[in-house]
Amino acid sequence: MKDIIIASFYKFIPLNDFESLREPILTKMHEIGIKGTIILAHEGVNGGFAGNREQMYIFYDYLRSDSRFADLHFKETYDNKNPFDKAKVKLRKEIVTMGVQKVDPSYNAGTYLSPEEWHQFIQDPNVILLDTRNDYEYELGTFKNAINPDIENFREFPDYVQRNLIDKKDKKIAMFCTGGIRCEKTTAYMKELGFQHVYQLHDGILNYLESIPEGESLWEGKCFVFDDRVAVDQKLDRVYPQLPQDYKYEREQK
Protein backbone atom coordinates (compact mmCIF):
# COMPACT_ATOMS: atom_id res chain seq x y z
CA MET A 1 0.00 0.00 0.00
CA LYS A 2 1.28 3.46 -0.89
CA ASP A 3 1.52 5.51 2.30
CA ILE A 4 2.14 8.98 0.87
CA ILE A 5 -0.68 11.17 -0.45
CA ILE A 6 0.31 13.75 -3.07
CA ALA A 7 -2.29 16.50 -3.42
CA SER A 8 -2.62 19.25 -6.01
CA PHE A 9 -5.11 22.09 -5.85
CA TYR A 10 -5.87 25.59 -7.06
CA LYS A 11 -8.53 28.24 -6.80
CA PHE A 12 -8.95 31.52 -8.63
CA ILE A 13 -10.28 34.00 -6.09
CA PRO A 14 -9.24 37.59 -5.29
CA LEU A 15 -6.80 37.60 -2.36
CA ASN A 16 -6.00 41.18 -1.43
CA ASP A 17 -4.12 39.94 1.63
CA PHE A 18 -2.18 37.15 -0.09
CA GLU A 19 1.20 38.41 1.15
CA SER A 20 0.11 38.07 4.77
CA LEU A 21 -0.93 34.44 4.22
CA ARG A 22 2.56 33.23 3.45
CA GLU A 23 4.08 32.94 6.92
CA PRO A 24 1.07 31.28 8.66
CA ILE A 25 0.78 28.65 5.91
CA LEU A 26 4.51 27.94 5.87
CA THR A 27 4.60 27.71 9.66
CA LYS A 28 1.74 25.19 9.60
CA MET A 29 3.48 23.09 6.95
CA HIS A 30 6.60 22.91 9.10
CA GLU A 31 4.56 22.17 12.21
CA ILE A 32 2.71 19.26 10.61
CA GLY A 33 5.59 17.96 8.49
CA ILE A 34 4.03 18.70 5.10
CA LYS A 35 6.40 19.13 2.14
CA GLY A 36 5.59 20.82 -1.16
CA THR A 37 5.11 24.20 -2.82
CA ILE A 38 2.18 26.60 -2.53
CA ILE A 39 1.88 29.70 -4.72
CA LEU A 40 -0.06 32.76 -3.55
CA ALA A 41 -1.03 35.73 -5.71
CA HIS A 42 -3.73 38.36 -5.89
CA GLU A 43 -5.65 36.07 -8.27
CA GLY A 44 -5.70 33.03 -5.95
CA VAL A 45 -3.77 29.98 -4.77
CA ASN A 46 -2.11 27.01 -6.46
CA GLY A 47 -0.06 24.21 -5.01
CA GLY A 48 1.13 20.68 -4.65
CA PHE A 49 2.18 19.04 -1.39
CA ALA A 50 2.52 15.62 0.21
CA GLY A 51 2.53 13.76 3.51
CA ASN A 52 0.99 10.79 5.24
CA ARG A 53 -2.78 10.53 5.61
CA GLU A 54 -2.92 12.08 9.09
CA GLN A 55 -0.70 15.01 8.11
CA MET A 56 -2.66 15.67 4.95
CA TYR A 57 -6.08 15.68 6.57
CA ILE A 58 -4.86 18.10 9.25
CA PHE A 59 -3.51 20.42 6.56
CA TYR A 60 -6.66 20.14 4.45
CA ASP A 61 -8.69 21.24 7.46
CA TYR A 62 -6.28 24.08 8.16
CA LEU A 63 -6.51 25.49 4.63
CA ARG A 64 -10.29 25.12 4.53
CA SER A 65 -10.62 26.96 7.84
CA ASP A 66 -10.25 30.18 5.80
CA SER A 67 -13.78 30.74 4.48
CA ARG A 68 -12.40 31.68 1.06
CA PHE A 69 -10.85 28.21 0.80
CA ALA A 70 -13.70 26.24 2.36
CA ASP A 71 -14.53 24.56 -0.95
CA LEU A 72 -10.98 23.68 -1.97
CA HIS A 73 -10.80 20.43 -3.93
CA PHE A 74 -7.62 18.40 -3.48
CA LYS A 75 -6.73 16.02 -6.30
CA GLU A 76 -4.87 13.07 -4.81
CA THR A 77 -2.34 10.60 -6.20
CA TYR A 78 -0.27 8.15 -4.17
CA ASP A 79 3.31 6.98 -3.83
CA ASN A 80 5.70 5.21 -1.47
CA LYS A 81 7.98 8.22 -1.22
CA ASN A 82 7.40 11.93 -0.69
CA PRO A 83 8.31 13.59 -4.02
CA PHE A 84 9.03 16.97 -2.39
CA ASP A 85 12.16 17.78 -0.40
CA LYS A 86 10.97 20.79 1.61
CA ALA A 87 8.07 23.14 2.37
CA LYS A 88 7.81 26.35 0.33
CA VAL A 89 5.24 29.13 0.07
CA LYS A 90 5.92 31.60 -2.73
CA LEU A 91 4.42 34.99 -3.58
CA ARG A 92 3.88 35.65 -7.27
CA LYS A 93 2.10 38.00 -9.65
CA GLU A 94 0.12 35.03 -11.00
CA ILE A 95 -0.53 31.55 -9.61
CA VAL A 96 0.26 30.20 -13.07
CA THR A 97 2.20 32.62 -15.22
CA MET A 98 0.74 33.41 -18.64
CA GLY A 99 1.61 37.10 -18.62
CA VAL A 100 -1.73 38.41 -19.90
CA GLN A 101 -3.50 41.03 -17.80
CA LYS A 102 -7.20 41.00 -16.92
CA VAL A 103 -7.87 37.32 -17.62
CA ASP A 104 -10.26 36.10 -14.93
CA PRO A 105 -10.95 32.34 -14.93
CA SER A 106 -13.12 32.68 -11.83
CA TYR A 107 -16.08 33.64 -14.03
CA ASN A 108 -15.09 33.21 -17.67
CA ALA A 109 -13.38 29.82 -18.10
CA GLY A 110 -14.27 27.29 -20.77
CA THR A 111 -16.89 24.56 -20.43
CA TYR A 112 -15.83 21.67 -18.19
CA LEU A 113 -15.98 18.14 -19.56
CA SER A 114 -15.79 15.12 -17.26
CA PRO A 115 -13.27 12.43 -18.27
CA GLU A 116 -16.10 10.38 -19.74
CA GLU A 117 -17.49 13.34 -21.69
CA TRP A 118 -14.00 14.28 -22.81
CA HIS A 119 -13.30 10.73 -24.01
CA GLN A 120 -16.25 10.93 -26.40
CA PHE A 121 -15.85 14.59 -27.34
CA ILE A 122 -12.27 14.41 -28.60
CA GLN A 123 -13.12 11.58 -30.98
CA ASP A 124 -15.13 14.06 -33.05
CA PRO A 125 -12.95 14.89 -36.10
CA ASN A 126 -14.32 18.43 -36.12
CA VAL A 127 -12.86 19.17 -32.67
CA ILE A 128 -9.48 20.90 -32.46
CA LEU A 129 -7.62 19.06 -29.69
CA LEU A 130 -4.96 21.32 -28.18
CA ASP A 131 -2.28 20.42 -25.65
CA THR A 132 -1.62 23.59 -23.62
CA ARG A 133 1.54 22.23 -21.98
CA ASN A 134 5.19 22.79 -22.77
CA ASP A 135 7.10 20.87 -25.42
CA TYR A 136 8.99 18.65 -22.95
CA GLU A 137 5.66 17.55 -21.46
CA TYR A 138 4.17 16.85 -24.87
CA GLU A 139 7.17 14.71 -25.84
CA LEU A 140 6.64 12.40 -22.85
CA GLY A 141 2.97 11.80 -23.63
CA THR A 142 -0.23 13.33 -24.92
CA PHE A 143 -3.69 12.48 -26.26
CA LYS A 144 -3.97 10.81 -29.64
CA ASN A 145 -4.12 13.44 -32.42
CA ALA A 146 -3.44 16.36 -30.05
CA ILE A 147 -1.80 19.48 -31.47
CA ASN A 148 1.55 20.46 -29.97
CA PRO A 149 1.81 24.28 -29.65
CA ASP A 150 5.59 23.83 -29.48
CA ILE A 151 6.14 26.24 -26.60
CA GLU A 152 8.96 26.23 -24.07
CA ASN A 153 6.90 27.85 -21.33
CA PHE A 154 3.31 28.88 -20.67
CA ARG A 155 4.01 32.56 -21.35
CA GLU A 156 4.38 31.69 -25.04
CA PHE A 157 0.85 30.28 -25.34
CA PRO A 158 -0.98 33.58 -26.07
CA ASP A 159 1.37 34.22 -28.99
CA TYR A 160 0.64 30.72 -30.32
CA VAL A 161 -3.08 31.46 -30.25
CA GLN A 162 -2.61 34.77 -32.06
CA ARG A 163 -0.48 33.17 -34.77
CA ASN A 164 -2.36 29.92 -35.30
CA LEU A 165 -5.93 29.99 -34.01
CA ILE A 166 -7.26 33.52 -34.30
CA ASP A 167 -9.18 32.64 -37.49
CA LYS A 168 -10.85 29.63 -35.85
CA LYS A 169 -13.12 31.41 -33.36
CA ASP A 170 -16.16 29.44 -34.53
CA LYS A 171 -14.51 26.02 -34.14
CA LYS A 172 -14.86 23.62 -31.22
CA ILE A 173 -11.59 23.70 -29.30
CA ALA A 174 -10.78 21.18 -26.54
CA MET A 175 -7.82 21.97 -24.29
CA PHE A 176 -6.07 19.98 -21.60
CA CYS A 177 -3.21 20.19 -19.12
CA THR A 178 -1.90 18.17 -16.18
CA GLY A 179 -4.26 19.19 -13.39
CA GLY A 180 -6.52 21.82 -14.93
CA ILE A 181 -5.11 25.18 -13.88
CA ARG A 182 -3.48 26.16 -17.17
CA CYS A 183 -6.69 25.34 -19.04
CA GLU A 184 -8.62 27.65 -16.74
CA LYS A 185 -6.45 30.51 -17.97
CA THR A 186 -6.18 29.51 -21.61
CA THR A 187 -9.92 29.02 -22.04
CA ALA A 188 -10.71 32.30 -20.26
CA TYR A 189 -8.15 34.08 -22.44
CA MET A 190 -9.61 32.63 -25.63
CA LYS A 191 -13.16 33.51 -24.62
CA GLU A 192 -11.99 37.08 -24.06
CA LEU A 193 -10.71 37.01 -27.66
CA GLY A 194 -14.12 35.92 -28.92
CA PHE A 195 -13.74 32.15 -29.29
CA GLN A 196 -17.24 30.73 -29.01
CA HIS A 197 -16.82 27.00 -28.30
CA VAL A 198 -14.02 26.40 -25.81
CA TYR A 199 -13.86 23.27 -23.64
CA GLN A 200 -11.49 21.94 -21.00
CA LEU A 201 -10.82 18.57 -19.37
CA HIS A 202 -12.03 18.90 -15.79
CA ASP A 203 -9.17 18.31 -13.31
CA GLY A 204 -6.83 17.59 -16.19
CA ILE A 205 -4.97 14.57 -17.48
CA LEU A 206 -4.53 13.01 -14.04
CA ASN A 207 -8.30 12.86 -13.59
CA TYR A 208 -8.70 11.24 -17.01
CA LEU A 209 -6.05 8.60 -16.27
CA GLU A 210 -7.73 7.80 -12.97
CA SER A 211 -11.20 7.57 -14.51
CA ILE A 212 -10.77 5.87 -17.89
CA PRO A 213 -9.61 2.21 -18.05
CA GLU A 214 -6.16 1.83 -19.58
CA GLY A 215 -7.47 -0.44 -22.33
CA GLU A 216 -9.89 2.25 -23.50
CA SER A 217 -7.69 5.27 -22.89
CA LEU A 218 -6.87 7.71 -25.69
CA TRP A 219 -3.77 8.84 -23.80
CA GLU A 220 -0.44 7.83 -25.33
CA GLY A 221 2.77 7.71 -23.28
CA LYS A 222 3.54 9.11 -19.84
CA CYS A 223 2.27 12.17 -18.02
CA PHE A 224 4.80 14.68 -16.74
CA VAL A 225 4.20 15.84 -13.15
CA PHE A 226 5.72 18.78 -11.30
CA ASP A 227 7.57 16.97 -8.55
CA ASP A 228 10.41 14.47 -8.15
CA ARG A 229 8.39 11.63 -9.65
CA VAL A 230 9.00 13.35 -13.01
CA ALA A 231 6.24 11.37 -14.73
CA VAL A 232 3.49 8.84 -14.07
CA ASP A 233 2.10 6.09 -16.27
CA GLN A 234 -1.54 5.39 -17.09
CA LYS A 235 -1.96 3.69 -13.71
CA LEU A 236 -0.60 6.86 -12.05
CA ASP A 237 2.49 4.97 -10.89
CA ARG A 238 5.89 6.65 -10.74
CA VAL A 239 8.14 6.11 -13.76
CA TYR A 240 11.70 7.18 -14.51
CA PRO A 241 12.08 8.26 -18.13
CA GLN A 242 15.51 9.19 -19.44
CA LEU A 243 15.64 12.97 -19.57
CA PRO A 244 18.29 15.30 -21.05
CA GLN A 245 20.91 16.55 -18.60
CA ASP A 246 19.88 20.16 -19.21
CA TYR A 247 16.20 19.35 -18.68
CA LYS A 248 14.47 22.30 -17.00
CA TYR A 249 10.87 22.89 -16.05
CA GLU A 250 8.68 25.15 -13.95
CA ARG A 251 7.21 23.23 -11.03
CA GLU A 252 4.49 25.77 -10.39
CA GLN A 253 2.58 24.94 -13.58
CA LYS A 254 -0.13 22.31 -13.69
Swiss-Prot record:
Function description: Catalyzes oxygen-dependent 5-hydroxyuridine (ho5U) modification at position 34 in tRNAs.
NCBIfam families assigned: PRK00142.1-3, PRK00142.1-4
SMART domains listed in its UniProt record: RHOD (SM00450)
Single GO MF descriptor: oxidoreductase activity, acting on paired donors, with incorporation or reduction of molecular oxygen
UniProt xrefs under SUPFAM superfamilies: Rhodanese/Cell cycle control phosphatase
Family classification: Belongs to the TrhO family.
PROSITE patterns the UniProt entry points to: RHODANESE_3 (PS50206)
Record-level GO BP terms: tRNA modification
Enzyme nomenclature, EC number: 1.14.-.-
UniProt catalytic activity: uridine(34) in tRNA + AH2 + O2 = 5-hydroxyuridine(34) in tRNA + A + H2O
Keyword rRNA processing in annotation: no
All copies of domain Rhodanese, residue ranges: 123-217
Signal sequence bounds: none
Keyword match tRNA processing: yes
Protein name: tRNA uridine(34) hydroxylase
HAMAP family on file: TrhO
Keywords: Oxidoreductase, tRNA processing
Catalytic residues in the record: 177 (cysteine persulfide intermediate)
